């Protein structure tokens, strides 16, 4: 089940963008926002504040990708590192089967979603390399989310 809402930051000076307009589109994103807001290693963060153009394999057109997060972290050795973060369920981080038993509408949607996500992530990785950043995909494993 997907939850969305407005996040109210406790440290608006850390937020890159308008701190009055922070929206989460899932509880996983909200959990990561709390981490960014409260963790002292996170110097700066933003939610959907970066735009990366990408070529969609589905329609062959240029689209705009808004990654979930931008974060700037002070590492243990004192160096500063910047990341672009995408929060996704683990099941959406691998391709659907190429030869399913039945090619259902759900399967076609999964194939389309996978193709578009793969293109977004490829362009995000290239964009990050050019901008001295690193692209990461966080799943429920990284966010320490357990299912009952």
Segments from the language model and where they lie:
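Electrostatic, structured charged patches in enzyme active sites and in nucleic-acid/phosphate-binding
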Residues: 1-148
């Amino acid at each position: 089940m997907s939850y969305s809402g407005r996040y109210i930051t406790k440290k608006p000076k850390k937020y890159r963008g308008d701190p009055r307009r922070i929206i989460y589109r899932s509880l996983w994103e909200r959990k990561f926002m709390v981490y960014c807001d409260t963790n002292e290693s996170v110097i700066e963060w933003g939610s959907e504040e970066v735009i990366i153009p990408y070529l969609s394999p589905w329609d062959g057109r240029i689209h705009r990708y808004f990654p979930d997060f931008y974060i700037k972290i002070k590492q243990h050795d004192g160096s500063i590192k910047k990341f672009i973060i995408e929060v996704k369920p683990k099941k959406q981080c691998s391709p659907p089967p190429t030869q399913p038993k039945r090619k259902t509408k759900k399967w076609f949607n999964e194939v389309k979603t996978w193709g578009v996500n793969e293109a977004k992530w490829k362009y995000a990785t290239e964009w990050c390399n050019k901008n001295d950043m690193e692209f990461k995909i966080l799943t429920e494993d990284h966010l320490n989310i357990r299912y009952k």
